[in-house]
């Protein structure tokens, strides 16, 4: 029984079927060949062979009764195998996730250690922000590809802002609306008389009439520190800045704005739309791209003073030439 229990039900059924077949062959052989039958000669009777056949049939019936139990057991085994496979998949997925987490944690620990080392080195050797700005300025000065329209050679404010510009910028003061440098014609609050060109003087050697011009082209009203991005904190934006913000390049007339000789006194500037007094035909002030910074107004005023002195000297030389020619004509008449 123990040996039969160790074997599978299929093997037991096959073995019982083979035994029944052999016993059945022996019975048929004995009945057909009684004289030549080996079983009869050895003392075995047909009755014993039939009993053996009945015993084999009984064993087969017992095995067949065990079939439903074995079927239930097999179905349970298959169900358990399916559940085991599913659990294996879940375990494999969790294992993969754990390995990925381990790799990510190892990387983050490595990078965190590097960052901590860099932070410790930076704490041991602090660097001023002004030094970084200077170095970045040197790098951008030699490797940059674009610049603002108002930038000139030697302008230290490009392209990175200074610390005071950070403090007065829109990030710290979001309510203050500031604009870039304004190149506007100021109102004629302080007018200066200048002498016109010799061509405008009278033909009889008389003195030329005096004319007045407005304030310098650069707006002298400064409000706070200058920044190439925020300006002096002006609230209004010039037409040129509006064109630059829209992506339109101003033409040469808008930058130079040369006064035409003999123009009316109520002419308006194309930049600000404010009335502007006509200047002398010989004095043409050409200022292009000067940013609104402290110190530029004095330079413009110095240029105007030099031009005024040159015009005065030319007028005096022309008047002396006219006096000399008049004296010569009088001597000839005498």
From Swiss-Prot:
The keyword Transcription applies. InterPro entries: Mediator_Med4. Keywords: Activator, Coiled coil, Nucleus, Transcription, Transcription regulation. GO terms for molecular function: transcription coregulator activity. One of its GO terms (cellular component) is core mediator complex. Residues 204-225, 264-282 have a biased composition (Polar residues). Belongs to the Mediator complex subunit 4 family. Component of the Mediator complex, a coactivator involved in the regulated transcription of nearly all RNA polymerase II-dependent genes. Mediator functions as a bridge to convey information from gene-specific regulatory proteins to the basal RNA polymerase II transcription machinery. Mediator is recruited to promoters by direct interactions with regulatory proteins and serves as a scaffold for the assembly of a functional preinitiation complex with RNA polymerase II and the general transcription factors. This is Mediator of RNA polymerase II transcription subunit 4. It comes from Caenorhabditis briggsae. The lineage of its organism: Eukaryota, Metazoa, Ecdysozoa, Nematoda, Chromadorea.
């Amino acid at each position: 029984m123990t040996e039969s229990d160790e074997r599978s039900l299929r093997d037991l059924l096959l073995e019982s079927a083979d035994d029944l077949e052999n016993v059945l062959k022996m019975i048929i052989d004995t009945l057909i060949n009684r004289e030549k039958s080996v079983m009869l000669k050895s003392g075995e009777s047909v009755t014993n062979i039939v009993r053996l056949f009945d015993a084999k049939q009984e064993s087969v019936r017992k095995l067949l009764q065990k079939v439903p139990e074995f079927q239930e057991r097999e179905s349970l085994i298959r169900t358990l195998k399916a559940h085991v496979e599913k659990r294996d998949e879940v375990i494999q997925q969790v294992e993969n996730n754990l390995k990925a987490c381990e790799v990510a944690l190892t990387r983050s620990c490595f990078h965190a250690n590097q960052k901590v080392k860099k932070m410790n080195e930076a704490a041991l050797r602090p660097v001023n922000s002004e030094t970084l700005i200077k170095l970045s300025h040197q790098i951008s000065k030699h490797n940059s590809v674009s610049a603002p329209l108002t930038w000139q050679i030697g302008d230290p404010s490009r392209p990175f802002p200074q610390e005071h510009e950070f403090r007065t910028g829109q990030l710290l003061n979001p309510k203050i609306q500031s604009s870039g440098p304004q190149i506007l014609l100021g109102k004629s609050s302080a007018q200066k008389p200048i002498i016109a060109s010799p061509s405008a003087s009278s033909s009889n050697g008389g003195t030329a009439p005096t004319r007045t011009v407005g304030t310098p082209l650069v707006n002298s009203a400064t409000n706070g520190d200058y920044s190439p991005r925020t300006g002096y904190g002006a609230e209004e934006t010039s037409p040129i800045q509006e064109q630059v913000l829209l992506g339109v390049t101003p033409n040469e007339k808008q930058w130079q704005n040369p006064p035409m000789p003999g123009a009316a006194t109520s002419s308006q500037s194309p930049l600000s739309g404010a009335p502007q007094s006509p200047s002398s035909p010989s004095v043409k002030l050409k200022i292009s791209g000067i940013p609104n910074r402290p110190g530029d107004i004095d330079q413009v005023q110095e240029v105007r003073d030099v031009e005024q002195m040159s015009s005065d000297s030319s007028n005096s030389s022309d008047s002396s030439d006219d006096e000399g020619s008049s004296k010569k004509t009088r001597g000839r008449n005498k």
